[in-house]
C-alpha cells in the first residue's frame, strides 16, 4: 500500500510517500518539503503567532493535496518539538484540524528517540549489536541506546540546531564569546545524561541520523547524497573538531557554499556541529556512521508492524 508520513518539524514540513508492505523494506516514492522554520515563528511568550499558524495550515493543505495526487491511502501526520513546546499548542492543533481536517499527533521527545532508534535498528539489523543513536533536529537532540528494537534508554534534550542558533548565536558570523558560551551550555546539558547510558555498557555501533549529521559528514569528506543510500558514510570526531573553529569563523553565506550544505540550514550548522562534537566527546565516540533512515521511517515501520499484527 502507499503510505504518507507528514512530519511537522522545527525547520520544515515534510511529506514522505512510500510504497510499503509488512515484512518488506519501505520504498520511497515521493518527497514534498517546505521550509517553514516554525521554531523561529514563536513570539516572546513562546506561542506560535497567528501568521505562523496561517502558514502552517497552508503548508499542511499543500502537503495534503500532494498526498492525494500521489495516491496515498493512509496518511500519518505528526508534529515534534516546535509544536510540542509552543505555549498555545492546543490552539494550533485545533486550527490545523479545523482548516485542513488533519489531526496532528504530537510526539513526545522520548517517542521521537524511540522511533528513530527503531529505524536505525531496522536499517543496520541485529548484527550491529548494542546501538547508540544520535539525532540532532531543529528543536532537540535525541539519544537512544539498546540491544533490541525498543531502546533501553532514550532521552530528548532541548539542544536542536535551530533552537540554539536563534537563542544563543544572534550575530553572523557569531561572536567568539557566544560560541564559547554555547559550547559550555551544550556540554553541561549532555553531561547530565551520560551516566544513564554509561551504566548500560559501551555500544558496539554508534550511528547518527538526520540532516545536521549528514551535512557535517559531507563537509568532512563523506559521499554525496547523489551516490545513493547504500554508500557507507562516516563522521570522525577528529575531523569534526578541526571543522568547528572554521565554521565559527564563517558567515552563514560562506557556510552555504560548503559541499552538501543547503542555504536554509547554513545559519544553524555551527550550533549543530557544537552539539555533535559535544555528544561524540562526552560519549567517547571516535567515529560514527550515518543512518539513512530516521524518525519518519520509524513512524512508517511502527505503522507497518501494527498492520501485521
From Swiss-Prot:
Q: Any idea which UniProt keywords this protein has?
A: Hydrolase
Q: CDD domains recorded for this chain?
A: ASKHA_NBD_MtPPX1-like
Q: Which GO terms describe its molecular function?
A: pyrophosphatase activity
Family matches, as Pfam families: Ppx-GppA (PF02541)
Q: Does the keyword Hydrolase apply?
A: yes
Q: Which domain of life is it from?
A: Bacteria
Coiled-coil stretches, from where to where? none
Question: Which PANTHER family does the UniProt record give?
Answer: EXOPOLYPHOSPHATASE, RETROGRADE REGULATION PROTEIN 2
Q: Which family does it belong to?
A: Belongs to the GppA/Ppx family.
Which protein is depicted? Answer: Uncharacterized protein SCO3348
* Source organism per UniProt: Streptomyces coelicolor (strain ATCC BAA-471 / A3(2) / M145)
Amino acid at each position: 500500500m502507499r503510505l504518507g508520513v507528514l512530519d511537522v518539524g522545527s525547520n520544515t514540513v515534510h511529506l514522505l510517500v512510500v510504497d510499503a508492505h509488512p515484512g518488506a523494506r519501505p520504498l520511497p516514492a515521493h518527497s514534498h518539503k517546505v521550509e517553514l522554520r516554525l521554531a523561529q515563528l514563536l513570539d516572546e511568550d513562546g506561542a506560535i503567532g497567528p501568521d505562523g499558524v496561517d502558514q502552517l495550515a497552508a503548508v499542511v493543505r499543500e502537503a495534503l493535496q500532494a498526498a492525494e495526487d500521489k495516491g496515498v491511502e493512509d496518511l500519518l501526520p505528526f508534529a515534534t518539538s516546535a509544536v510540542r513546546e509552543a505555549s498555545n499548542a492546543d490552539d494550533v492543533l485545533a486550527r490545523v484540524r479545523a482548516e485542513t481536517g488533519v489531526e496532528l499527533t504530537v510526539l513526545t521527545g522520548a517517542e521521537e528517540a524511540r522511533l528513530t532508534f527503531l529505524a536505525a535498528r531496522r536499517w543496520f539489523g541485529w548484527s550491529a549489536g548494542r546501538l547508540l543513536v544520535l539525532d540532532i533536529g531543529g528543536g532537540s537532540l535525541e539519544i537512544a541506546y539498546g540491544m533490541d528494537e525498543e531502546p533501553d534508554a532514550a532521552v530528548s534534550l532541548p539542544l536542536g540546531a535551530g533552537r540554539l542558533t536563534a537563542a544563543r548565536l544572534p550575530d553572523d558570523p557569531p561572536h567568539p564569546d557566544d560560541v564559547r558560551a554555547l559550547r559550555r551550555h551544550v556540554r553541561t546539558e549532555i553531561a547530565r545524561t551520560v551516566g544513564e547510558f554509561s551504566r548500560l555498557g559501551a555500544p558496539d555501533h554508534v550511528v547518527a541520523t538526520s540532516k545536521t549529521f549528514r551535512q557535517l559528514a559531507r563537509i568532512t569528506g563523506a559521499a554525496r547524497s547523489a551516490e545513493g543510500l547504500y554508500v557507507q558514510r562516516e563522521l570522525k570526531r577528529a575531523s569534526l573538531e578541526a571543522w568547528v573553529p572554521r565554521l565559527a569563523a564563517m558567515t552563514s553565506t560562506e557556510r552555504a557554499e560548503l559541499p552538501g550544505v543547503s542555504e536554509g540550514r547554513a545559519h544553524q550548522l555551527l550550533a549543530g556541529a557544537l552539539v555533535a562534537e559535544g555528544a561524540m566527546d562526552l560519549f567517547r565516540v571516535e567515529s560514527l556512521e550515518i543512518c539513512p533512515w530516521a524518525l519518519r521511517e520509524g513512524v512508517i515501520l511502527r505503522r507497518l508492524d501494527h498492520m501485521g499484527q
